Amino acid sequence: MQKRHTDRKMYFHDLEITSKEFYVSYLSTFKKLTSKSRVLEVGCGEGGNLVPFAQLGCRVTGIDIAECRIIDAKVYFSEICENATFVCCDFMKYHAPINDEEKFDVILLHDVIEHVPAKGEFLLHLKSFLKSTGVLFVGFPAWQMPFGGHQQICRSKLCSHFPFIHLLPNSMYNSLLKLCKEEEGTISELMSIKECRTSIELFEKLIKRCEFSVVDKKFWFINPHYKQKFQLTPSLLPRFVWKIKYARNFFTTSCWYILNLSNT
C-alpha cells in the first residue's frame, strides 16, 4: 500500500493537483466554468477533485457515503473556500432537484462506477441531477488493465505490486489475498470490485441504454494521475487500439468520457 492511501491529506492534495492540471482543462473544452457554474461530484471522498473548481468560483457539492471522508472534506475545505457543500448519504437515496436551475452544469464521477453494483439504475438517477445543457465526466480504470482490481490498496507488497492478479478465478484470488494476510475488510472490498467490474464495452452499453450521448472520450495508456503518483508522463493509447474491442481493456489504465443528455 502506498503512503497516499493512509495519509489522506496527501491523497487530497494529489487529487487536487491532477484535477487542476487535467480535469478542469478537459472539461472547460466542453463547458464554460464560471462563478455561476454548479459542480457536483458523486463519490467525492475528501473532495480533492473539487478544489480547482471551487477556486474558479464554481459552487461545488460533494456526496459520499463514508462519513469519515465527508468530515475530512469539510475540514480541508474550511481552509480553502466557503462555496462548498458536502453531504454524507447513499446517493441512490438522495433526492434529485425538481427545477433545471437547481441541477448541475457539471457532474464528476471519477473512480466510482467500478464500485457500483446496479450501474444502470445509478446512471439513471445521476441523469436526473444534470442540467439539460450540462455535462457528465466519467473516469474509470478498464477492468482488465494491470491494476483494474484496485489491488494497490493491499498492504502486502506482492498483492499491491503484482499486475493482473484480480483476473484470477474468485477462489484463487480470495485464497491469495488470505495467504498474503490481507485484512478481511480489504478482501471484501476487492472481491466486491471484482463482482462490479467495469469494462469499456459494458460501460458503453450502459450509457446507450440510459440515453446519454458521448461528446468525447479518451483512453489513457498512462493515466494522467500517474504523473502525480509516479512522476510518469501521461500518454493516450494509440488510436488504432481504441477500436480493438476487449483487447483495449488490457492497456487502458483510465477511460474518460464526456457525456450529455441525448435530447440536447
Task: Please give the residue ranges for each predicted region.
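Short glycine-/acidic-enriched loop or helix-start segments at secondary-structure transitions
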Residues: 51, 72, 118-119, 147-149
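A generic structural signal for alpha->beta connector loops
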Residues: 57, 81-83, 133, 211-214
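S-adenosyl-L-methionine-dependent methyltransferase catalytic module, highlighting the catalytic core
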Residues: 120-125, 135-260
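A short beta-strand submotif of the Rossmann-like class I SAM-dependent methyltransferase core
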Residues: 109-112
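Active-site micro-motifs of SAM-dependent methyltransferase domains
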Residues: 93, 114, 145
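Helix-to-beta-strand junctions that scaffold the AdoMet/dcAdoMet cofactor pocket
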Residues: 116-117, 130-131
